[in-house]
Amino acid sequence: MSFKPIDYLPYDFANRRHIGPSPAEMTQMLEVTGAANLDALMDDTLPAAIRQKEPLAFGKAMSEREVLEHLRRVASKNQVLTSLIGQGYYGTVTPPAIQRNILENPAWYTAYTPYQPEISQGRLEALLNFQTMVSDLTGLEVANASLLDEATACAEAMTMAQRVSKSKSKAFFVDRDCHPQNIAVMQTRAAPLGIEIIVGNPDKMDAEAVFGAIFQYPGTYGHVNDFTDHMAALHAHKAIGIVSADPLALTLLKEPGAMGADIAVGSTQRFGVPEGYGGPHAAYMACRDAYKRAMPGRIVGVSVDSHGHRAYRLSLQTREQHIRREKATSNVCTAQALLAVMASMYAVFHGPEGLRAIAQRIHRKAVRLAKGLEEAGFTVDPQAFFDTITVDVGPLQAAVMKSAVDEGINLRRVGETRVGISLNERCRPDTLEAVWRAFGITRADNDFRPDYRFPEEMLRTSDYLTHPIFHMNRAETEMMRYMRRLSDRDLALDRAMIPLGSCTMKLNSAAEMMPVSWRDFSLLHPFAPVDQAKGYTEMIDDLSAKLCQITGYDQISMQPNSGAQGEYAGLLSIAGYHRANGEAHRNICLIPMSAHGTNPASAQMVGWTVVPIKSADNGDIDMADFAAKAEQHAANLAGCMITYPSTHGVFEETVTEVTRITHQHGGQVYIDGANMNAMVGLSRPGDLGGDVSHLNLHKTFCIPHGGGGPGMGPIGVKSHLAPFLPGHEMTGGGEGAVSAAPFGSPSLLPISWAYCLMMGGDGLTQATRVAILNANYIAKRLEGAFDVLYRGPTGRVAHECVIDVRPFEKSAGVSVEDIAKRLIDCGFHAPTMSWPVAGTLMVEPTESETKAELDRFCDAMLAIRAEIADIEEGRMDAANNPLKNAPHTVDDLVSDWDRPYSRDQGCFPPGAFRVDKYWPPVNRVDNVFGDRHLVCTCPPMEDYAEAAE
């Protein structure tokens, strides 16, 4: 007897697992769309002129098992030594409870930015804990919910200082003891804005000549200085004082607020987040209350819901780029929410006593190490330090460094004659012995019990982390349950489709995520010798080659840490190109009115003037307006920024005409890669006339959104722009660093690399085709009930569609927000609201969603339309109905029901699961109350008790 062959690939072939609809379901969906097959649908959707000529030549897809084995082999080529290099990156211990329940938990890492507060209360509380931690440690009133890295935070603080300072100066003072990468990124940011950077000795600073100053605390070479007098001098001349501070050191040392600092920034990396060869890590920023509206980044605040119960939300959003555009405080979009949550949980896990004990142990080891070196005759500097010292070894520098490597230790090269040593949480007594041996010391007093090695007046006297949340979860059982309670309040991709237009919330597969936690990727210091990072080098080179093939560009830079930072880096490369050609005067950037808010904000950051371009009635770029303005500004045209396919969800046929006109008038073309999920394998921006693009690896290439970060936004360029890609002080060359580490956040790259390897070229192309199919299926199913605002010439949409709900405001008093909140009752995150057109919903299903989930969403939308019809026709009260009262909570269900519709209709609309229903923890959040009564730190414990009841 023989078995009949079954057409079934092994379970671990990702291209069968990543793509949601089965082949049979695709056939059914194609019938609904009216397309004969996928090829015909692609022909209808993409203009022939923009199709790429050759398929992706990646080879066949590898199975999950094969890819993981391959990644193990590559990772093993990295040599993970004990790095005592410091310079802003330190060994830390990630509590397994946090690694398992946060970092490796899809309930946390697949969530989106918490713009819909009712379904984001868990991570909003965790981020509020982060803000409280930062505010307490720095001694400043208001903190944000993270920035990309410490160097970026320094640059943001500099430009914030310029905004709020009353000084007329254009100069900014930088402490020479700042980390070199911080100085480099500030210099990059300052140049196009006309800010003069003065690097020098703080004691010789001319406070009258600057609008602000930044000081490193402790300094990059270990100095612990009191900057109180410097702050007073700055304030006397209406200038702003900034401190870039190590938060762990602040558990022992005088806080920046007590010195008079106006702004504090830094990295929370050593709060349980591994070095990761540079990232990702959550930077922080805190400031005085008077300056809170000028602070970049997201701020979590406390508000109330429609029943008066406490609720969290993102506050002061009118500062942000998606609203203010070129007038925004920054182009910050993606931040580091997941890493901020980890850092906050590290503080909750250890509490103030635990953090202080960790800091004390590190300091004692540093003092013990210094004493052993001094007793052996070495000169150690500084005398006052926290965890970092430098040692004068004269001509023996290279020998000592090599000897340390032989002992399994990386030290820092300082100048020509000194060696730097920074101790950390992972250091043990045998670490000190290995360092001593590298210096030729065979015996030292390892039992010495040292005192503090900084002046008594520098000891911190104020309390911190006094809120009960930092004192209540010592047992791991309670910690585990606390993290579970928070995640249960949220709606992430592990529960339901998140159909956010322009956000590409696709599957982040378990196999892709696994390598992030491997020690060979996670424990490498970004400034370790390059020969210790051979695995990273191989991976980055191969992934870069694949991305070049996908985009049609010639070179890739992995340095940008987000899409917005990629935009900034790309525009800097264009500016560098013009400058090299003697055309530095080119400073006009043409940007369509429909562009992402980051586009005009990024253009402003490189010192350009934004000239907006009108949209035609069909949503396309108004070509007459574009051509006229390109000609009008030809003498000064730097370039244009466009998104393709457009932000309206359509492949515009005029894209090559846009690029031709721009080049004709001397400009360069930036094609925003936000919608690359509709192009991979089908069309390449480099072939359309693009000179530079960024890629959102946290969209198209499967890095998870993490509730608002991490992200990566590498840029691809044509060869003529390659000399102007971001450089780094550790790698040399280029126009200047935009991130703290040479490759941004490289510990995320195994995710995108694994995705490419597991899908293969054919699989990546099929993913694009199915993403387009899914969007067209939704558009067709909703046809008749809702208008799709924009379509291509053949009636197709790209990978997303814009649903027009504006008529319902007039016919039934139903707003786009009402529909978004009603979708929560159905168990869905709302699509993108009021963008690119106010009063619309932009839907992007991605290729990962099954037909069943797409149908559930469509059923929910159609049921909502029926409810709107009931209001329109008088069958339902216009003010008291399921849409106006959405979302409904368990409290609503079990309380006295006095509404003119049933409990069942209110709480269990079509699309909602009855058994596994998601219940939002709060009713609709009051946005106005939250901004008028801004509270950005943890509320009193009584409020937590109330919530628990």
UniProtKB/Swiss-Prot annotation:
GO terms for cellular component: cytosol; glycine cleavage complex. Its cofactor is pyridoxal 5'-phosphate. Keywords: Oxidoreductase, Pyridoxal phosphate. Gene3D superfamilies: Aspartate Aminotransferase, domain 1, Type I PLP-dependent aspartate aminotransferase-like (Major domain). Its EC number is 1.4.4.2. SUPFAM superfamilies: PLP-dependent transferases (SSF53383). GO terms for molecular function: glycine binding; glycine dehydrogenase (decarboxylating) activity; pyridoxal phosphate binding. The keyword Oxidoreductase applies. The keyword Cell division does not apply. GO terms for biological process: glycine decarboxylation via glycine cleavage system. The modification N6-(pyridoxal phosphate)lysine is found at residue 699. It is an enzyme of class 1 (oxidoreductase). It catalyses: N(6)-[(R)-lipoyl]-L-lysyl-[glycine-cleavage complex H protein] + glycine + H(+) = N(6)-[(R)-S(8)-aminomethyldihydrolipoyl]-L-lysyl-[glycine-cleavage complex H protein] + CO2. The glycine cleavage system catalyzes the degradation of glycine. The P protein binds the alpha-amino group of glycine through its pyridoxal phosphate cofactor; CO(2) is released and the remaining methylamine moiety is then transferred to the lipoamide cofactor of the H protein. The glycine cleavage system is composed of four proteins: P, T, L and H. Belongs to the GcvP family. This is Glycine dehydrogenase (decarboxylating). It comes from Roseobacter denitrificans (strain ATCC 33942 / OCh 114).
